[in-house]
Amino acid sequence: TRFAAPELATTKSTMLSALTSMTTPAWAFATSSTSFPTAQAPVNTPLRLRILWNAKASAKAEAQALPALEGPLQLCLSKTPLPAQDPLLSHKTTHRPWYQDAAALLEKHPQLFDVIFLDTQSRVCEGSRSNIYIQDEQGHWWTPPAQGWLLPGVQRQALLNSGLARETELFLDDLLHARAIRVSNALRGWQNALLVQNPV
């Protein structure tokens, strides 16, 4: 579920105020008052359901076929760091200016699954559509802490709750020398990945 920025929300403070004032989860509105679309896809084809919910408690649902993936998933690094401690980074909204270049790159190079972002201190943050994990030499999986510079995904939290992953600060050097890399999101689960050279 993604929060849709209201038409009148022209500033970050307005958006944050709308986000923090909500007491009813998006799915409550979506399941009670939203008619879900029918995607044009063969029977038994996995679908992606996207629910947009705004501060006026209006919900919109979109559905489309979810194509299969072949692993390991290919990742590349963003050339632009994420802004330091932007409060909107930890919310799932349609206000995503820092990911626009990544979206264009992924559309141009469909062999890539995601673009991984660092902050201005070369700390690993997240992908534009996934959380990231690295495995150390002891076989432990680590993911960056959710301290204002990443979206704490549902799948990520499930992995933390189960003890399969732990939080710690990760830097570019950790990523480059990781024993293994994985990414996760609620659509795709926890997937093996590899870092490849940025396409020209």
List PLM regions with ranges:
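Helix-start/capping segments and mature chain N-termini
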Residues: 1-4, 26-48, 52-200
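Extreme N-terminal basic, low-complexity initiation segments
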Residues: 3-11
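Intrinsically disordered, low-complexity segments enriched in small polar residues
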Residues: 10-25, 31-35
